[in-house]
Amino acid sequence: MNTLIPSEKRWIITGVLLAGLVGGALLFTSFIRAADETLFLCSTASAKSRAVAAAADYEATPIQLQAIVHYATSNVVPQQNLAEISISFNILKKLAPANFLVFGLGRDSLMWASLNPRGKTLFLEEDLEWFQKVTKDSPFLRAHHVRYRTQLQQADSLLRSYKTEPKCFPAKSYLRGNEKCKLALTGLPDEFYDTEWDLLMVDAPKGYFAEAPGRMAAIFSAAVMARNRKKPGVTHVFLHDVNRRVEKTFAEEFLCRKYRVNAAGRLWHFAIPPAAANATIDSGDYRFC
């Protein structure tokens, strides 16, 4: 027999689940580190001093504690559901501390930052009023207000025109200062370009009305950064709202179905290898996939 949960109690349950998720992440990280340290202590003469140093490393970061309190006491919950969040969370558990780039500030920002303890989590937000509100309430978040060159109503023309602009081609693609490629994100803070990102979450900018920036440039630029990766391993790209035509079309054009490794609800997860891992790259080919 199904039991309906009263609507006024749903936010309490969701908040507790999220607080548990953050707390679980903290416990998981501490357990793994403690296990590693125990093995090490058994084989070293300086066990005591290293144990003291390790204990400090196990302590929860302020942002983790803030997240637990926030989601346990608030009726404001993230945009993504638990199944969608869990996909990114499972990768963060493996890679943290990592370099994590998130397009958009929102009700989930505190959660994402807390799930990447001692890593770099950077948020990019195009709505100035919303940026000011979120950063005022959570001044410890690392965030930049940014501007985009595109509009959602240009999506189809951008998808056609990039195929005739060599600066957009995968063999020659770059972002900083690439004014000729309209899909390249330019004019952003140096931190965006200078950091090699391990994970990218594309859940912004707005893409539900004609004059909105749309996510075309964010998706294209995520693909470029992943292909230009210098460090070992793949770049994980998470794209939300794939139920919408533009998100789905641009994902299949630039992130590639062959690199999609997981999905839940409205979220797709791609694991994209560096372009150097490909045997041959045709400098005159516009295709990413």
Swiss-Prot record:
Enzyme class: transferase
EC number(s) reported in the record: 2.1.1.-
Subcellular location: Golgi apparatus membrane
UniProt entry keywords in alphabetical sequence: Golgi apparatus, Membrane, Methyltransferase, Transferase, Transmembrane, Transmembrane helix
This protein's record includes keyword Metal-binding: no
Chief location category: Golgi
Molecular functions per Gene Ontology: glucuronoxylan 4-O-methyltransferase activity
Disrupted gene: phenotype observed: Strong reduction of methylation of glucuronic acid in several oligosaccharide chains of plant cell wall components. The double mutant agm1 and agm2 results in the absence of methylation on arabinogalactan glucoronic acid side chains.
GO (cellular component) term, any one: Golgi membrane
Membrane topology: Single-pass membrane protein
InterPro entries to which the protein is assigned, alphabetical: IRX15/GXM/AGM (IPR006514), SAM-dependent_MTases_sf (IPR029063)
Pfam family, one: IRX15_IRX15L_GXM
Protein family (similarity comment): Belongs to the methyltransferase superfamily.
NCBIfam families, alphabetized: A_thal_3515 (TIGR01627)
Subunit structure comment from the entry: Binds to the translation initiation factors TIF3E1.
Chain's role: Involved in the methylation of glucuronic acid of different plant cell wall component, but mainly on side chains of arabinogalactans.
Name of the protein in question: Arabinogalactan O-methyltransferase 1
Species for this entry: Arabidopsis thaliana
